[in-house]
Amino acid sequence: MSKLIQLDRRSFLKSASLTAVGGSLASVTNIGSAAEMGQGGIKNGKFNFDEIYDRDGTGNVKWDSQYARFGAENIDVGMGIADMDFRGSPAIKEALEKRIKHNNWGYELLQESYIESIVQWNSERHGLTVDPATIKISSGVHTPLIAALNAVCKPGTKVLLNTPTYNGFYGDLHWSRTEINDSEMYKDDDGVYHIDWDDFEARMTPDTYAFILCNPQNPTGNMWSEEDLMKMGELCLKKGVVVLADEIHCDFVMKGQKYVPFASLPDKAIVDNSVTMKAISKTFSLASMKSAYYFSTNSALLDRVNYMHRADINSLGIVANEAAYRHGVDWFDQLLPYIDENHNFAEAYIKEKLPLVKYKKAQGTYLAWLDVSAVGEAIDAEKNASDKGMKSDTHYLEQWFVDNAKIQLNPGVGYGTGGNGHMRMNLGTPRPLIKKAIDNLADALSNV
């Protein structure tokens, strides 16, 4: 095994610097010392997202659960689950510290100021006006989505999804006792996904009651245009299919792209046929704070969902989320271009170092959807998966990447029809770690 791969993550965290990438690629900044960084990971008055912030031992899923699965010595870079590895916004920490000083944790009322902060964020960042009276708070996007599915679908009926799509939706279908109805998208020659409109409409059979829209699309990174969303909405309205819009990644819009909220569409009837679910948990990496919300312009539809929904508030989650909405904008405004450059760097560096891997820069999210079908062919992933009793070629690829490159990526098969031959890589991490992951993989594939 190469010296590169033998350098484990803990040694890497202690390293003083990494070599900058030459040529036209984005540079990888040296890892600053604590003294250089200053308090809270701030360097020269700016948030330093190149800082390698050690999350080990906090019980986090992205790193610690992978150590439990594969052994800590076998993971240099965890790039699976969709949360970020950066220090959070100082505003969130300050608000939590202030609340914790009050040492009582009884039942709490939801404050109007929190709803107001949600309305303000949507208005100022996305030009979307949301009636505060229609906003309902939940513990995460899954909870209202399951409630909505139970509200509009009979057990055993179908739910339409454009695939590849977020793997968590399939669990939501299980808990709502509904059936999968995948409409596979297609890739053009540039690697961009598009909806197969003929198939999309054909799958709107009388027993299909709902369509789960992922906007932007996880894992492919599509930022859906108004034209696309209108066509989806028109077909759903025509066929009696309710649109359930998961827009949790909506703040991560890459340069030159645009996020169009489904609720902003110009046709009232189309918008009234929908429920939107959102959270700021991706934006500020607050997944464990368990706070989200949903809304609809259709009061009757909203009442049906509310009837099926139950979620109490998390007091610290509300504090953290409101602090993010009101005081975290500077942090996020610095983070967003950093994520955009991570995508640029990954696309260029993969092209340079990994001829067997294809990646087209995502239009949104901090996720990279990698075409690793050529790698699968080179290592005979399908046969090896079958011989070892694994679920799919991409499950074998996940294990192979850990064994040979010490990186963990999510298997593509979990993202529905069309996921085979792909892996999802999380780019919400310091650029030096992205470089290390690609270098490790390049070294491993040099022997194939």
Task: Name each model feature, range by range.
Residues 273-352, 357-364:
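PLP-dependent aminotransferase class I/II
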Residues 45, 150-213:
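PLP-dependent aminotransferase-like
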